[in-house]
Amino acid sequence: MFDRFLRAGRQLLGDSPATQPAQPFAGTPLRPRVLMIIHNPPVESQGGRRLTEIFGWNDPERLARQYAADLAECSYGGLQYQIVETIDADWFPLKLDGFRYTAESYVSSWRARKMHEPDRIDYQAQVAAFELIGRYERNEIDEVWFLTFPYAGDYESTMVGRGAFWCNSPPVPNTGHCDGRFVIMGFNYERGVDCMLENFGHRTESIMSHVFQHHPPAQNLWERFTRYDKIAPGQSQCGNVHFAPSSAHDYDWGNPRTVRSFCDDWYSFPDLGGPGRMVERSEWGGGDMRLHHLWWLKHLPHVAGATNGVSNNWWEYLALARDPDRPARPAGERLGRHR
């Protein structure tokens, strides 16, 4: 109760709660072990240069380091990815219809902007080629990142294994024999870290929607977290990956409107009794994609305890692919923090 009066006093005095530090991350940091697989083949006709060199695309390993650093920052040190192995896979992965690019055919297709359709990668072939289920079951890894060229056909994220559910894409089929579940991320190294954070944001939306799927509206804190002014006038909270509190349409992070929002409440979760205040685009980067996503992720609850049967540390669900209705292995058996 005292916190509510304190926040109200700050509002009257013009001391915005947004300038106040969020609560520290609860408990021991999560340290998921990542297998990173890079498809960046050399092209013989181009002097053996790799795709990134030929087309001036980003360094995959540098992208991965910045992505991990960004997530560590916006989780208040709570999510610390550990890249335990990197595989340079110097070939083009198989597509679902059996097609596979050669180095020469890919370069010519990209230059002509005539890429193969259908585009989708064969995930079952990828899981088998890199023995992903075996690595997971031997407790070597907790997550997989594929860093690939444009039109490799990867989903932004997908899930593998027993109890797998929608993770911005359907689960990888025929993997239910896996003793647990894990997430595969797909990143396009033509693009930047902003897009990688967008992938993680949609993963967040999928997992937290699943966690709260059986909660009645009054107890659905995920639905509350994602409100924005267009759908909840005067009652916006943090919005979602595509919609900031003031956005009028997808990707409209730079909308100049000023709207009332209760986004600051999430810095003091589970106390959500704040008075709200007027907010505008400069708080989340003025339209910059990466800055918006960092701002949004920093508002995710990350404290001890539980509310209505859901952990108050939502990062646990995101890092562990946890599902309160269909538990896989106990969390203590899966993360590198317990080695």
Task: Give the role of each language-model region.
Residues 2-21:
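Intrinsically disordered, low-structural-confidence terminal and linker regions
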Residues 20-134, 155-156:
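Propeptide-to-catalytic entry region of secreted or membrane-anchored zinc metalloproteases
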Residues 38-41, 147-151, 187-188, 206:
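Active-site-proximal beta-strand/loop segments in catalytic clefts of secreted hydrolases
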Residues 133-173:
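Auxiliary, metal-adjacent structural segments of Zn-dependent hydrolase domains
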Residues 168-189, 295:
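Flexible, surface-exposed loop/gating regions in the mature catalytic domains
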